[in-house]
């Protein structure tokens, strides 16, 4: 059984027990979080697709920790113009473990 849900403008495909990185949610480690925006649930041959969300479906997860990703550096240089731009970005994330997929 797997589910597809939406969080922070992105879609994630998860199974029970999987560990994923979500956008930062400012929660304490070991706390529980409920993800309600479930787009689809697939259980063997049975597929349940929501319009836009599956009614009564939710995903229960546990927060493992919060952190920051590796730095991504973008560099632009315009030749012969002595013009350059360097920017760095680090993503803040919350690492969660999927405990249970509930479909009614």
Swiss-Prot record:
In which domain of life is the source organism classified?
Answer: Bacteria
GO molecular function ontology, one term from the record: rRNA binding
Q: Which UniProt keywords apply?
A: Ribonucleoprotein, Ribosomal protein, RNA-binding, rRNA-binding
Coiled-coil stretches are none
Q: Which family does it belong to?
A: Belongs to the bacterial ribosomal protein bL21 family.
State how it assembles: Part of the 50S ribosomal subunit. Contacts protein L20.
The protein's name in its UniProt record: Large ribosomal subunit protein bL21
């Amino acid at each position: 059984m797997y589910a597809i849900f939406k969080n922070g403008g992105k879609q994630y495909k998860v199974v029970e027990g999987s560990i994923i990185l979500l956008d930062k949610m400012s929660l304490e480690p070991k706390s529980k979080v409920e993800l309600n925006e479930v787009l689809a649930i697939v259980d063997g041959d049975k597929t349940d697709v929501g319009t836009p969300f599956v009614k009564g479906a939710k995903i229960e997860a546990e927060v493992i920790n919060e952190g920051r990703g590796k730095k991504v550096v973008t560099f632009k240089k315009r030749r012969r113009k002595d013009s350059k731009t360097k920017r760095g970005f680090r993503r803040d994330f919350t690492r969660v473990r999927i405990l249970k997929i509930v479909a009614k």
